Amino acid sequence: MKLEKTERHGTVREGYQILLRADAELLLPEDKPLMRAFYERMGETCMTWAQAIHGETLRKEFLSLDGIREKSQFGTQRYDFRMRCVWEEDAFAAILCESELLGQWREPQKSYHRISHVWNTEEELVLPFPQILDRFGVRLPKNRLPFRPDGIYPDGDQMVFFRNVTEHTPFLEKKLPRNVNKNNPK
């Protein structure tokens, strides 16, 4: 699958002060119009959220500060959205999207989220979890994972299972071996 790099940049300001820098880097498939449109829309939605919604929250926080000194010490936050193809084999490809919001110098990272899709590139369809597990030879006995995954994708001879950050849990990731030959499980 041939990929084309697309970048988007945005800034949220209040007067002279830069409150947020938002960047998106997308490696979009050139020859797959449905996949391309899907990820273009996702990138646009994430950039809109960063600039309009989170930017407005930062603007209110900045304007509520008293005095020039506190406003001058208000650090710039950074939002990064990256989309790339992490794995490709035959008629299948795994696309990984990572969204990271970096706080000010006092709070190094505010949030990190990951979304993955495994596509049948010939039909341009996203595979559901059970079909991904079956197709890539992963057998999950009960309680093998210490968490319920938000996403899965193949990475070489392993399957990566992950769960995004919530209020009470950190980002979790576990890699399990992938059975290439389904008749001979490892």
Q: Where are the regions that the model predicts?
A:
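Compositionally biased intrinsically disordered regions enriched in Thr/Gly
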Residues: 1-186
